[in-house]
Amino acid sequence: PGALRGLVQALPEGASEARLACLHRLWDVGSNDRWWAARTALAELETPRMGYDHDAAAVKQWRKRLERAQESEERAWEELSHPTYFSHIARHDLSEFELGEFQAELARCTPIARAWLVRKNLREHPQRRAYLLFVELPGMDDEDRYELCRSLERTLGLPGPVLALWAGESPTLQEIRRSAFEPVFSR
């Protein structure tokens, strides 16, 4: 799947048919890239080009695919963010390099006292790398903690989606210590 995605991105501007063929193959392998494939195919089909006729059937097919892929992505996010945070988790799977980069990112975020990272095994996308990040943020009010967690979700360079949660009412610091393995970062 990664090679097909790279090929689609590397094909020249005029290679619309080849790009669409690769996107069909990417969709057919049932990969985690279906949402991307559908959006890219629709962008390709909806871009007016000299010498190409509008293919209404293909646009309709890719719109349906995009809708299915979006529903799948929503189910995956619901599963990741469901309050049974500690079910279907495993130790993080980051390489030493990835972990070092991640720890450097956390070190730049001064409010974080400690952090735990676990991999969440998603039933919707079992091959996808998805993570839960639990952070201890002493001395902050809940509104600021919430904003910081959303910011971490957008900016951290993890190889998959991440849901950031602070130690508090749910989950509690005790639950995190008991279930999230050892901290990956400590100040």
Feature-to-residue mapping (PLM):
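Alpha-helical adaptor scaffolds
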Residues: P1-S16, C22-D28
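"A position-specific structural signal for the A-helix of alpha-solenoid helical repeats
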Residues: G2-G6, R39-E44
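A contiguous, surface-oriented mixed alpha/beta subdomain in the mid-to-C-terminal portion of proteins
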Residues: A3, Q70-G168
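Alpha-helical junction/boundary sensor with strong preference for TPR arrays
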Residues: L11-G14, V29-R34, E46-R49
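Alpha-helical repeat scaffolds
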Residues: E17-D28, D53-L66
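Extended alpha-helical scaffolding segments
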Residues: A21, W35-A43, L132-F134, M140-R145
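Short, low-order "capping/linker" segments at domain edges
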Residues: P171-R187
